[in-house]
Amino acid sequence: MNRLKKHYEEIIRLDMIRKFNYVNPHMVPKIDKIIVNMGVKEAASDKKQILAPLLILELITGQKAIVTKAKKSISNFKIRKGFPIGVSVTLRGNNMYEFLSKLITLVLPKIRDFKGVPFTSINKYGHLAIGIKDLLVFPEIESEYDKFNRVYGANIVIVTTAKTKKEAGVLLSGFQIPLNKR
């Protein structure tokens, strides 16, 4: 069993039951999935530009990434329906906990001038959105730095089953995600 999953089952879950007085054990919030997404605007003009972000996401998540395509044409952005515009990975189960552990212990502390994730990054549905401007902070990418011609960023969304912002904040704080109450 993963370290974070065990921590959730043995400590966080019990703390949340005490704090929020849930009557049913299935009401206790948990992390449902983690979505890692990269938008690649250059891919609209040159389809080969999608390969590097695809490889990066597969390296950092350990799971096959999918290419996201434009749902409709937008002439101002020179995008046609069906053009590749990004890559995405949805993590669940053990892969999710492994990625979260890596994010908390290795990646977030390496980000320069990182003062924590703002509490306002949690939306009303209890989902936390984190933007990382430079993926070179991931250990898998550091050693492969010379293979990529530019710096890539990504959006990471941690989807929880929490009903309120407060529940989500307590849950994510239990996982040692540094939240700032700004």
Swiss-Prot record:
Subcellular location: Mitochondrion
Keyword tRNA processing: no
GO molecular function terms listed in the Swiss-Prot or TrEMBL record: structural constituent of ribosome
GO biological process, one term: translation
Entry keywords, A to Z: Mitochondrion, Ribonucleoprotein, Ribosomal protein
GO cellular component terms, A-Z: mitochondrion; ribonucleoprotein complex; ribosome
Broad class of the protein's primary localization: mitochondrion
Family (UniProt): Belongs to the universal ribosomal protein uL5 family.
Name of the molecule in the record: Large ribosomal subunit protein uL5m
